Amino acid sequence: IESEYLTPGAVLRIGGSLLVYCEIDLPQAMAAFAPLPRASLARLRAEALIDTVAPSELPVLIQGPTGAGKELLATRVHQKSGRKGALVAVNCSTFSKELIGSELFGHVAGAFSGAASNRTGLFAAANEGTLFLDEIADLPLEQQPALLRAMQEKKIRPVGSDKELAVDARVVAASHKKLSELTTAGNFRADL
C-alpha cells in the first residue's frame, strides 16, 4: 500500500505490532493531565489510546520504566471504562509466595493455618470494576495459570473452597520489565 486515508479507530498491523489511529484534541487532552506538572506529547498520545481501549472489556498491559505514571494510566482506563465497581490496586511484588492465591482469590475458614475466617480476595473486591496488578512480571509462574483462568472464565475459587464464584473484574496490569523477554526465558506465560 502506498497511501491510504485513515479514520479514527482504524487498526493497522505492521509486522508483529498493532497500531490504532487516534485523533487528539490537544486542549481536552491537556486538561486530562492537569494534575501533572508536564503534560508531554507521549502522555497525550497515551490519553488518546486510553479513550480507545477503556470502553472495551479486554485486559490492558501498561509497560514503562518506574516512575512513568503507569498507575495514573490504569486509573484513567478505569475512570473512562464505565465500570460501576471499584478500582482495586495491588503491587504483585509485595505478595508472599505462600499467600498469593489467598490474596487474589480469597479463602475460606480453615483453608490453611491462620485462616480463622472467610476472606474476600482482590478479584471479588474488584467485581464490576478494575483490578490493577502492578509489577505483574513478579507474579510467580506457578500462580499464572490461576490468574489466566480467572481472566478468561471470569470465575474464581477461593483457597480451600470447592465452589467457584463468578466475578466480573477487568484486569489492567503494568510492568517495568519487558514481558516478551520473560516469556522467551520461560519465566512468564505467553498466553497471559
Which residues does each predicted region cover?
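AAA+ ATPase active-site-proximal loops
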Residues: 29-166, 171-177, 182-183
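Charged helix-capping and loop-helix junction motifs
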Residues: 185-188
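C-terminal boundary/linker segments immediately following FHA domains
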Residues: 2-39
